[in-house]
């Protein structure tokens, strides 16, 4: 979210009643507001959190990783990742709190998905108090080369 400072001429009822309404020099009242940029629906990964994702790891589908992070990799490299154990450090931006966190993206050779593990639990589940049933979304920011994360539906 973007924080902006706006100045307004509007006063509270108390300020309006206590000031002289004939005075042409009304003071400006600064007010800080948060603006979430209006954009197309960018969420490439939308998940309703399960118990496994709260206590263990956040699964990211191989197709989404291939289409985003590995889009410049050759078909041979992508084929090799299916049968190898892979681990890489990535950045994840929490759009709700405007913070950036480092995470480890990991893939086991027997699984077809990538996963965020320990860093997911510490940086997101505990810090944001995520619970089973919340809907979260992620997308890959191509300009910043990082995932962007947000809680889309916080109802429990």
UniProtKB/Swiss-Prot annotation:
CDD domains reported in the protein's UniProt record: B3_DNA
DNA-binding recorded as keyword: yes
GO function terms (MF aspect): DNA binding
Localization per record: Nucleus
Gene Ontology, cellular component aspect: nucleus
Keywords: DNA-binding, Nucleus, Transcription, Transcription regulation
The entry's DNA-binding region: 57-155
Chief location: nucleus
Recorded superkingdom: Eukaryota
PANTHER family to which the protein is assigned, alphabetical: GENOME ASSEMBLY, CHROMOSOME: A02, TRANSCRIPTION FACTOR B3-DOMAIN FAMILY-RELATED
The protein, known as: B3 domain-containing protein At5g26805
Lineage, broadest ranks: Eukaryota, Viridiplantae, Streptophyta, Embryophyta, Tracheophyta
